[in-house]
């Protein structure tokens, strides 16, 4: 009774206060509680140091969201490579550098979960039953199904299709119109997402599907892409216009794929050597005998194209801007391409998949772009069992998150000389080559979708690592290499003020801030 009376007396006292005093208490109590909680948390020796923050729940979201790499470096200087911060109600434990890559990417499946970290974000975009909306074992098999369309023989067929799409874009898009113009200005944040989706749909989904992928269809993918924002990560569904457009785009794209799948099945028109759709229609039965439904295949197609879209659109936009800042690098690539074609006695139309492997300046430019501008600045896993951090007394409790940032290591002077300088030639050195993970590493593991390098302690991991390593790395190099050689063979360009735009971290994928334009002119070898 004494406790009840005390509570009643407290309520009566609160009600007797003025409105101003009541509001002050209501606003002040959460802040006081937050400060006390942080102090008590800091006393625990089994927890990574927590970055101090003033605003409850919101935490360090502003400083992290605006400049994540600067935020990481500032925290590292104060706490070391391991620390935690509050992000919109979630405690993120960060482990920077190659040891952090090893800790997160090679963590046991029983200890961390990418599915629990991303499912609420990706399922409204991709659809149900695929990627993170299924057990990890299913995802590993889905990746294996997709890899049947990502073979060397497939890449050989893709190169001329990708080049043809780019050349057609040069003729038809208002940014270029190369049959009518000799010079002009192009916004790479318009051109590169479109070129990427047109080339990917043509090569991966076939000629019939490409005819459906007009600019209005590309806009649907743009609406889907807007579902990958920080607000979507926190609030998967809100009654807001961009959520409605995301959902409408998902339904329309999925229905389009379903129609094509149904048509091919009814016609019996399925060729295992044609494209990704046919490959999935043939290879889509799990080890336990369960078959993917056509709806799940359609959803997986969305996920695959979206994954590649992010990497290639952002990477090609960035390398066009950097090469515009340093046109002499374009000339190095141009001479390399021209000399190779001269030996063959042909022009750009004769450039093959095998030729792309003989162009070190092209591949080094892509590699350097991915170093400076990794599409995802942070990668999360949700902790499902208490997780001890090696060589420390820290334990990450169940329900918290671990965060790794290869992009931080890519741009840190601890691992790369002059990291802020765009220098493709750095990859010619033996030390730099040793930093990159080889496709043919002898230390390999098979998570269910084919062997990948087990080693993830490299400071350079643009395609991630472990069981969630991107399976599209080689396709990305084929697509990006063809885009780069086609641009350089036909055009020479600069950027205004010879200054590359700053990165925009407001979305989940790091893109250039607007305006992001190149000023182009035709080369003498231009094909129009």
From Swiss-Prot:
Effect ascribed to mutating residue 279 to F: In strain: fluconazole-resistant isolates
Pathway annotation: Steroid biosynthesis; zymosterol biosynthesis; zymosterol from lanosterol: step 1/6
Pfam family, one: p450
E.C. designation(s): 1.14.14.154
Protein's UniProt keywords contain Oxidoreductase: yes
Record keywords, A-Z: Endoplasmic reticulum, Heme, Iron, Lipid biosynthesis, Lipid metabolism, Membrane, Metal-binding, Monooxygenase, Oxidoreductase, Steroid biosynthesis, Steroid metabolism, Sterol biosynthesis, Sterol metabolism, Transmembrane, Transmembrane helix
Residues reported in the UniProt entry to bind heme: 470
Recorded consequence of changing residue 132 to H: In strain: azole-resistant isolates
Residues that hold oteseconazole according to the record: 64, 377
Mutagenesis or variant effect for residue 266 to D: In strain: fluconazole-resistant isolates
Binding site for itraconazole: 118
Cofactor(s) required, per the database record: heme
Binding-site positions, posaconazole: 307
InterPro entries, per the entry: CYP450_sterol_14alpha_dmase, Cyt_P450, Cyt_P450_CS, Cyt_P450_E_grp-IV, Cyt_P450_sf
Effect listed in the UniProt record for changing residue 149 to V: In strain: fluconazole-resistant isolates
Function recorded in the entry: Sterol 14alpha-demethylase that plays a critical role in the third module of ergosterol biosynthesis pathway, being ergosterol the major sterol component in fungal membranes that participates in a variety of functions. The third module or late pathway involves the ergosterol synthesis itself through consecutive reactions that mainly occur in the endoplasmic reticulum (ER) membrane. In filamentous fungi, during the initial step of this module, lanosterol (lanosta-8,24-dien-3beta-ol) can be metabolized to eburicol.
UniProt name for this protein: Lanosterol 14-alpha demethylase
Natural source organism: Candida albicans (strain SC5314 / ATCC MYA-2876) (Yeast)
